[in-house]
Amino acid sequence: MLHHYGKKYYSLGSSILVTSSPEPYLLLASVAGAAFVVLVTTAASKHGTVVGGVLTALPLTGAWAVAIIGVTQGIGSATGAVGGYLLGAGVWFSFLLSYAILAKWGFWQALALAFLVWGVMTSVVFVSGVRDFLTCLAGGTALSIAILCVYFKRLKFEDYKGERRDVGWTKLVARFVGSFAILLVALGLSSVRGPFLGGLVSTAPIISSQIVYWTYIEQDIEFSRSVTKNIVLTGTILIIPYGASIWWFYQYFGRSFGTVYGIFFGTLCGYGIAAVGAYAAYRVATFLAEKQILASQSSP
Protein backbone atom coordinates (compact mmCIF):
# COMPACT_ATOMS: atom_id res chain seq x y z
CA MET A 1 0.00 0.00 0.00
CA LEU A 2 2.85 2.30 0.85
CA HIS A 3 4.52 1.52 -2.44
CA HIS A 4 1.37 2.38 -4.35
CA TYR A 5 0.89 5.60 -2.41
CA GLY A 6 4.47 6.59 -3.00
CA LYS A 7 4.15 6.13 -6.75
CA LYS A 8 0.92 8.18 -6.85
CA TYR A 9 2.45 10.97 -4.83
CA TYR A 10 5.53 10.84 -6.91
CA SER A 11 3.79 11.19 -10.22
CA LEU A 12 1.83 14.18 -8.96
CA GLY A 13 4.89 15.73 -7.32
CA SER A 14 7.00 15.36 -10.44
CA SER A 15 4.49 17.17 -12.61
CA ILE A 16 4.45 20.08 -10.18
CA LEU A 17 8.16 20.24 -9.45
CA VAL A 18 9.32 20.24 -13.04
CA THR A 19 7.51 23.50 -13.60
CA SER A 20 9.31 25.22 -10.71
CA SER A 21 11.50 28.10 -11.76
CA PRO A 22 15.13 27.04 -11.16
CA GLU A 23 16.75 30.46 -10.73
CA PRO A 24 15.88 31.14 -7.05
CA TYR A 25 16.94 27.63 -6.07
CA LEU A 26 20.22 27.84 -7.97
CA LEU A 27 21.06 31.12 -6.29
CA LEU A 28 20.10 29.80 -2.87
CA ALA A 29 22.18 26.65 -3.41
CA SER A 30 25.24 28.68 -4.37
CA VAL A 31 24.89 30.88 -1.29
CA ALA A 32 24.53 27.79 0.91
CA GLY A 33 27.64 26.17 -0.56
CA ALA A 34 29.73 29.31 -0.06
CA ALA A 35 28.49 29.76 3.50
CA PHE A 36 29.39 26.13 4.18
CA VAL A 37 33.01 26.75 3.14
CA VAL A 38 33.24 29.75 5.48
CA LEU A 39 31.84 27.68 8.36
CA VAL A 40 34.14 24.69 7.84
CA THR A 41 37.38 26.59 7.29
CA THR A 42 36.76 28.77 10.33
CA ALA A 43 35.96 25.70 12.46
CA ALA A 44 39.07 23.87 11.21
CA SER A 45 41.34 26.81 11.98
CA LYS A 46 39.94 27.17 15.49
CA HIS A 47 39.24 23.58 16.50
CA GLY A 48 41.65 21.44 14.48
CA THR A 49 41.82 18.98 11.61
CA VAL A 50 39.34 16.47 13.02
CA VAL A 51 36.52 19.02 13.29
CA GLY A 52 37.31 20.49 9.87
CA GLY A 53 37.41 17.08 8.19
CA VAL A 54 34.22 15.85 9.82
CA LEU A 55 32.27 18.97 8.85
CA THR A 56 33.56 18.93 5.27
CA ALA A 57 32.43 15.35 4.69
CA LEU A 58 28.89 15.80 5.96
CA PRO A 59 26.54 15.05 3.03
CA LEU A 60 25.03 18.53 3.22
CA THR A 61 26.10 19.93 -0.14
CA GLY A 62 25.32 16.73 -2.00
CA ALA A 63 21.95 16.48 -0.27
CA TRP A 64 21.21 20.07 -1.24
CA ALA A 65 22.20 19.44 -4.86
CA VAL A 66 20.05 16.31 -5.19
CA ALA A 67 17.10 18.00 -3.49
CA ILE A 68 17.23 21.01 -5.80
CA ILE A 69 17.56 18.77 -8.85
CA GLY A 70 14.28 17.30 -7.59
CA VAL A 71 12.76 20.77 -7.29
CA THR A 72 13.80 22.00 -10.72
CA GLN A 73 13.67 18.79 -12.78
CA GLY A 74 11.45 16.33 -10.94
CA ILE A 75 11.92 13.47 -8.50
CA GLY A 76 12.89 11.03 -11.25
CA SER A 77 15.87 13.22 -12.14
CA ALA A 78 16.85 13.48 -8.48
CA THR A 79 16.95 9.71 -8.03
CA GLY A 80 18.92 9.46 -11.26
CA ALA A 81 21.47 11.87 -9.81
CA VAL A 82 22.12 9.68 -6.77
CA GLY A 83 24.15 7.14 -8.79
CA GLY A 84 26.47 9.89 -9.95
CA TYR A 85 26.62 11.22 -6.40
CA LEU A 86 27.80 7.84 -5.06
CA LEU A 87 30.47 7.33 -7.70
CA GLY A 88 31.41 10.99 -7.40
CA ALA A 89 32.23 10.49 -3.72
CA GLY A 90 34.90 7.93 -4.60
CA VAL A 91 36.31 10.19 -7.31
CA TRP A 92 36.31 13.12 -4.88
CA PHE A 93 38.30 11.06 -2.37
CA SER A 94 40.78 10.29 -5.16
CA PHE A 95 41.29 14.04 -5.53
CA LEU A 96 41.99 14.38 -1.80
CA LEU A 97 44.37 11.42 -1.76
CA SER A 98 46.28 12.77 -4.76
CA TYR A 99 46.65 16.13 -3.06
CA ALA A 100 47.73 14.56 0.25
CA ILE A 101 50.43 12.47 -1.44
CA LEU A 102 51.78 15.22 -3.70
CA ALA A 103 51.53 18.18 -1.30
CA LYS A 104 54.97 17.58 0.22
CA TRP A 105 56.44 18.74 -3.12
CA GLY A 106 54.44 21.99 -3.14
CA PHE A 107 50.87 23.12 -2.58
CA TRP A 108 50.00 24.51 -6.01
CA GLN A 109 51.61 21.66 -7.94
CA ALA A 110 49.74 19.14 -5.80
CA LEU A 111 46.42 20.95 -6.17
CA ALA A 112 46.75 21.24 -9.96
CA LEU A 113 47.65 17.56 -10.38
CA ALA A 114 44.85 16.51 -8.02
CA PHE A 115 42.34 18.46 -10.12
CA LEU A 116 43.75 16.73 -13.21
CA VAL A 117 43.23 13.32 -11.60
CA TRP A 118 39.68 14.27 -10.64
CA GLY A 119 38.90 15.57 -14.13
CA VAL A 120 40.19 12.44 -15.84
CA MET A 121 38.33 10.10 -13.48
CA THR A 122 35.11 12.10 -13.76
CA SER A 123 35.29 11.99 -17.56
CA VAL A 124 35.93 8.24 -17.55
CA VAL A 125 32.98 7.60 -15.24
CA PHE A 126 30.66 9.81 -17.30
CA VAL A 127 31.55 8.40 -20.74
CA SER A 128 31.60 4.81 -19.48
CA GLY A 129 27.81 4.79 -19.49
CA VAL A 130 27.55 3.25 -16.01
CA ARG A 131 24.21 4.36 -14.59
CA ASP A 132 22.90 1.33 -12.68
CA PHE A 133 22.38 2.24 -9.04
CA LEU A 134 23.84 -0.94 -7.53
CA THR A 135 26.90 -0.71 -9.78
CA CYS A 136 27.44 2.92 -8.74
CA LEU A 137 26.95 1.98 -5.09
CA ALA A 138 29.45 -0.90 -5.28
CA GLY A 139 31.99 1.14 -7.25
CA GLY A 140 31.79 4.18 -4.98
CA THR A 141 32.02 2.04 -1.84
CA ALA A 142 34.99 -0.01 -3.07
CA LEU A 143 36.92 3.07 -4.19
CA SER A 144 36.22 4.92 -0.93
CA ILE A 145 37.35 2.01 1.26
CA ALA A 146 40.50 1.46 -0.82
CA ILE A 147 41.47 5.13 -0.47
CA LEU A 148 40.73 5.07 3.25
CA CYS A 149 43.06 2.09 3.65
CA VAL A 150 45.87 4.00 1.94
CA TYR A 151 45.41 6.86 4.40
CA PHE A 152 45.57 4.66 7.49
CA LYS A 153 48.03 2.02 6.31
CA ARG A 154 50.50 4.14 4.33
CA LEU A 155 50.18 7.85 5.04
CA LYS A 156 49.27 7.79 8.76
CA PHE A 157 48.79 11.54 9.18
CA GLU A 158 48.64 13.00 12.66
CA ASP A 159 45.70 15.10 13.82
CA TYR A 160 46.43 18.74 14.67
CA LYS A 161 44.74 21.14 17.05
CA GLY A 162 43.58 24.53 15.86
CA GLU A 163 44.22 28.00 17.22
CA ARG A 164 41.41 29.96 18.85
CA ARG A 165 41.84 33.30 17.12
CA ASP A 166 39.58 35.74 15.34
CA VAL A 167 39.30 35.55 11.56
CA GLY A 168 39.08 38.87 9.74
CA TRP A 169 36.02 39.77 7.69
CA THR A 170 38.19 40.19 4.60
CA LYS A 171 39.16 36.53 4.70
CA LEU A 172 35.60 35.42 5.31
CA VAL A 173 34.31 37.42 2.36
CA ALA A 174 37.11 36.09 0.15
CA ARG A 175 36.21 32.51 1.07
CA PHE A 176 32.53 33.15 0.41
CA VAL A 177 33.11 34.74 -3.00
CA GLY A 178 35.63 32.11 -4.04
CA SER A 179 33.22 29.25 -3.28
CA PHE A 180 29.98 30.75 -4.62
CA ALA A 181 29.80 28.67 -7.83
CA ILE A 182 29.94 25.14 -6.38
CA LEU A 183 26.32 24.00 -6.70
CA LEU A 184 25.48 26.45 -9.46
CA VAL A 185 27.90 24.56 -11.71
CA ALA A 186 26.57 21.18 -10.64
CA LEU A 187 22.94 22.08 -11.22
CA GLY A 188 23.69 23.82 -14.49
CA LEU A 189 25.44 20.71 -15.78
CA SER A 190 22.56 18.53 -14.61
CA SER A 191 20.08 20.56 -16.66
CA VAL A 192 22.27 20.50 -19.78
CA ARG A 193 23.85 17.04 -19.67
CA GLY A 194 21.47 15.13 -17.42
CA PRO A 195 21.06 14.53 -13.68
CA PHE A 196 23.75 11.82 -13.47
CA LEU A 197 26.47 14.38 -14.28
CA GLY A 198 24.87 16.81 -11.84
CA GLY A 199 25.12 14.20 -9.09
CA LEU A 200 28.69 13.38 -10.11
CA VAL A 201 29.76 17.02 -9.93
CA SER A 202 27.85 17.69 -6.69
CA THR A 203 30.75 16.00 -4.89
CA ALA A 204 33.26 18.06 -6.87
CA PRO A 205 36.40 19.15 -5.00
CA ILE A 206 35.60 22.85 -5.39
CA ILE A 207 34.55 23.12 -1.74
CA SER A 208 37.28 20.85 -0.37
CA SER A 209 39.95 22.61 -2.45
CA GLN A 210 38.91 25.88 -0.82
CA ILE A 211 39.17 24.21 2.57
CA VAL A 212 42.65 22.75 2.01
CA TYR A 213 43.76 26.11 0.58
CA TRP A 214 42.62 28.16 3.55
CA THR A 215 43.93 25.67 6.09
CA TYR A 216 47.25 25.74 4.24
CA ILE A 217 47.34 29.56 4.27
CA GLU A 218 46.35 29.90 7.93
CA GLN A 219 48.23 26.89 9.32
CA ASP A 220 50.67 24.91 7.17
CA ILE A 221 50.88 22.16 4.56
CA GLU A 222 50.82 19.28 7.08
CA PHE A 223 47.69 20.68 8.71
CA SER A 224 46.07 20.87 5.29
CA ARG A 225 47.05 17.29 4.42
CA SER A 226 45.73 16.01 7.74
CA VAL A 227 42.31 17.56 7.10
CA THR A 228 41.92 15.39 3.98
CA LYS A 229 42.26 12.20 6.02
CA ASN A 230 39.32 13.12 8.24
CA ILE A 231 37.27 14.19 5.23
CA VAL A 232 37.70 10.76 3.65
CA LEU A 233 37.04 8.91 6.91
CA THR A 234 33.81 10.77 7.68
CA GLY A 235 32.74 10.74 4.03
CA THR A 236 33.12 6.97 3.78
CA ILE A 237 31.05 6.52 6.93
CA LEU A 238 28.27 8.94 5.95
CA ILE A 239 28.05 9.68 2.23
CA ILE A 240 27.66 6.13 0.91
CA PRO A 241 24.90 5.14 3.40
CA TYR A 242 23.22 8.51 2.82
CA GLY A 243 23.19 8.04 -0.95
CA ALA A 244 21.71 4.57 -0.63
CA SER A 245 19.08 5.81 1.82
CA ILE A 246 17.99 8.82 -0.17
CA TRP A 247 17.65 6.77 -3.37
CA TRP A 248 15.11 4.52 -1.65
CA PHE A 249 13.28 7.16 0.42
CA TYR A 250 12.86 9.55 -2.50
CA GLN A 251 10.78 6.99 -4.32
CA TYR A 252 8.32 6.60 -1.45
CA PHE A 253 8.24 9.88 0.43
CA GLY A 254 9.11 12.53 -2.13
CA ARG A 255 11.75 15.24 -2.02
CA SER A 256 11.31 16.85 1.41
CA PHE A 257 10.66 13.86 3.65
CA GLY A 258 12.95 11.71 1.51
CA THR A 259 15.84 14.07 2.20
CA VAL A 260 15.13 14.19 5.95
CA TYR A 261 14.72 10.42 6.27
CA GLY A 262 17.76 9.83 4.08
CA ILE A 263 19.99 12.02 6.24
CA PHE A 264 18.70 10.44 9.47
CA PHE A 265 18.88 6.79 8.44
CA GLY A 266 22.05 7.27 6.39
CA THR A 267 23.82 8.84 9.36
CA LEU A 268 22.46 6.23 11.77
CA CYS A 269 23.46 3.38 9.46
CA GLY A 270 26.87 4.88 8.71
CA TYR A 271 27.86 5.39 12.31
CA GLY A 272 26.36 2.02 13.24
CA ILE A 273 28.49 0.23 10.65
CA ALA A 274 31.54 2.23 11.74
CA ALA A 275 30.95 1.33 15.40
CA VAL A 276 30.57 -2.38 14.61
CA GLY A 277 33.68 -2.28 12.42
CA ALA A 278 35.70 -0.48 15.09
CA TYR A 279 34.59 -2.97 17.74
CA ALA A 280 35.43 -5.92 15.49
CA ALA A 281 38.86 -4.46 14.76
CA TYR A 282 39.43 -3.93 18.49
CA ARG A 283 38.48 -7.53 19.28
CA VAL A 284 40.74 -8.91 16.57
CA ALA A 285 43.65 -6.73 17.73
CA THR A 286 43.09 -7.83 21.35
CA PHE A 287 42.96 -11.49 20.35
CA LEU A 288 46.19 -11.24 18.35
CA ALA A 289 47.93 -9.39 21.19
CA GLU A 290 46.86 -12.01 23.75
CA LYS A 291 47.96 -14.78 21.42
CA GLN A 292 51.37 -13.17 21.03
CA ILE A 293 51.74 -12.79 24.82
CA LEU A 294 50.86 -16.44 25.40
CA ALA A 295 53.31 -17.52 22.72
CA SER A 296 56.11 -15.48 24.29
CA GLN A 297 55.34 -16.89 27.77
CA SER A 298 55.34 -20.48 26.56
CA SER A 299 58.63 -20.17 24.70
CA PRO A 300 61.74 -21.21 26.72
Predicted segment positions?
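Structural signature of hydrophobic alpha-helical transmembrane segments
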Residues: S21-G33, L55-T56, I75-V91, L134-L143, ...
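Membrane-interface helix-loop-helix junctions at boundaries between adjacent transmembrane segments
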Residues: G76-Y85, F93-A138
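A generic, lipid-embedded transmembrane alpha helix
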Residues: T56-T72, L238-G243
